[in-house]
Amino acid sequence: MKLYCLSGHPTLPCNVLKFKSTTIMLDCGLDMTSTLNFLPLPLVQSPRLSKLPGLVLKDGSTFLDKELKECSGHVFVDSVPEFCLPETELLDLSTVDVILISNYHCMMALPYITEYTGFTGTVYATEPTVQIGRLLMEELVNSIERVPKAQSASTWKNKEVQRLLPAPLKDAVEVSMWRKCYTMPEVNAALSKIQLVGYSQKIELFGAVQVTPLSSGYALGSSNWIIQSHYEKVSYVSGSSLLTTHPQPMDQASLKNSDVLILTGLTQIPTANPDGMVGEFCSNLAMTVRNGGNVLVPCYPSGVIYDLLECLYQYIDSAGLSNVPFYFISPVANSSLEFSQIFAEWLCHNKQTKVYLPEPPFPHAELIQTNKLKHYPSIHGDFSNDFKQPCVIFTGHPSLRFGDVVHFMELWGKSSLNTVIFTEPDFSYLDALAPYQPLAMKCVYCPIDTRLNFIQVSKLLKEVQPLHVVCPEQYTQPPPSQSHRTDLMIDCQPPPMSYRRAEVLTLPYKRRYEKIEIMPELADSLVPLEIKPGISLATVSAMLHTKDNKHVLQLPPKPPQPPTSKKRKRVSDDVPECKPLKPLLSGSIPVDQFVQTLEKHGFSDVKVEDTAKGHIVLLQEAETLIQIEEDSTHIICDNDEPLRVKLRDLVLKFLQKF
């Protein structure tokens, strides 16, 4: 059993598990933090960005001034943002049989895998994961394609050039794996390979293993996966939550009795309480609006935004914000809000019951009906007619490198009345803001991450008690910025096995058993022999038939009849020859009785010596030695076959044949 780690990002995993002749990819997350090294893509020409000076190296060289620009002490690539792909050279990805997706954030690299590696297998995911994943990909493609860049920067990626650059470009890793965004035809082709599954649905893979998705409690349709054979069980836990938000609660019971538990996707901000962050979000939003400022919330079009809108629904009136407009701007805003209302079966119990009242599960439906929340595909068209200030705008992308958020950062960044509130934990907010400096608007960091923290993980592992835990190396040591916090790491016994990008782990669990069926007619022919009270054994002479990883014992073929004619026999008519079996022996040889038997048969001067494993019987006159051990007996005599046969027969009198 081997695990190939293709991603270095613990919350955007991509691993490949080789288990029982199947090759299973576990998620294909796309590391977008690489985009922080690029300049933003403004929707309209930005004089500020276009006037940024080109990079001059320490030796005065200016050959990179077209590719790299300086802004407030930072260096950025002036090109279309690129994303860090999972490893594609560690193993041949065309050999991957299936891809299991745990949630919509962990499928963003899917088009790169399915369309560029020769992959011909099947992808399994739940319906909400596929539909919302499609929305995220569509928004990503739309945001980048609508702002085309004339130039493409690649010279700086040369290793000899990169080492001359200032940080963080100098320290950027895996730049050879950075790629431009895929296209919508590639997205559609990738999604066409997905087969929809439901929670607890058992899927057979080639008769070798069975995979089952379980609710992980993190997002709509998010899943953990059980991968098991008849005697082995691997649990894949990725992006799970024990908090009561909108998705179905996490299924923990099914994770018990795992031989190996692969753990990824823990919270990125273990010291922040999600409830406290929501409270800070609401209070900072209200304070800004009361002072006449605007609030910008960079976000994804699904997920935390549903919970934020629900909190604001309860908070608006009490905070005196009834007349403040809320705008949700995304090319997929309408689809996202509608999908959240129709996936009732994937919601927590409280929201499911509302569907049968009938009421919309999420209160943002009422916010839309009362015109308190308005959604638009972009800042053009209807939005420009309806736009009123002060207001609150939810829009993407959280990296601040593309999407409508770039326009509002340029528009509102010069006023200290305005506030940008970061709620998504995927990007460093200081790095996200770097190309907008100097910035007058206030910045508030309220990261909301409902995934498991280390205390919850420790409790979970004690409850499910896996034999072995495997996790990213980041989880086996405290965060670099808080090296004294030993509580911010996984603590379990035995210690977890850790992995890093481009590593191959040989998992410690080895297969011990294989299930074999026996045909009824063969079972009827067996004659068990009792060798101990309550224990019977029978020898089996059979033919093993294996197909689709299922093994069946069948009656041995009958000996072939001699041909009645001189026709040539076809190869397919050949029947494997079944040789007669030698009888098996069981039992033990009582040494004292054996010596008496030897003496009765004319052997004198018999001596017995004890050994660590049994006894040695010496027949001194015959110069013969008999080794008697727990699981074997050896007769050693020089070139005297009649004597050996006689002694063998005496030994056999004490053993049972079957």
Swiss-Prot record:
Transmembrane segments: none
Motif (Nuclear localization signal): 566-570
Alphabetical UniProt keywords: Cytoplasm, Nucleus
Cell compartments where the protein resides: Nucleus; Cytoplasm
Region (Disordered): 550-574
GO cellular-component term (any): INTAC complex
Subunit structure: Component of the Integrator complex, composed of core subunits INTS1, INTS2, INTS3, INTS4, INTS5, INTS6, INTS7, INTS8, INTS9/RC74, INTS10, INTS11/CPSF3L, INTS12, INTS13, INTS14 and INTS15. The core complex associates with protein phosphatase 2A subunits PPP2CA and PPP2R1A, to form the Integrator-PP2A (INTAC) complex. INTS9 is part of the RNA endonuclease subcomplex, composed of INTS4, INTS9, INTS11 and inositol hexakisphosphate (InsP6).
Note: Although strongly related to RNA-specific endonuclease proteins, it lacks the HXHXDH motif that binds zinc and participates in the catalytic center. Its function as endonuclease is therefore unsure.
Protein name stated in the entry: Integrator complex subunit 9
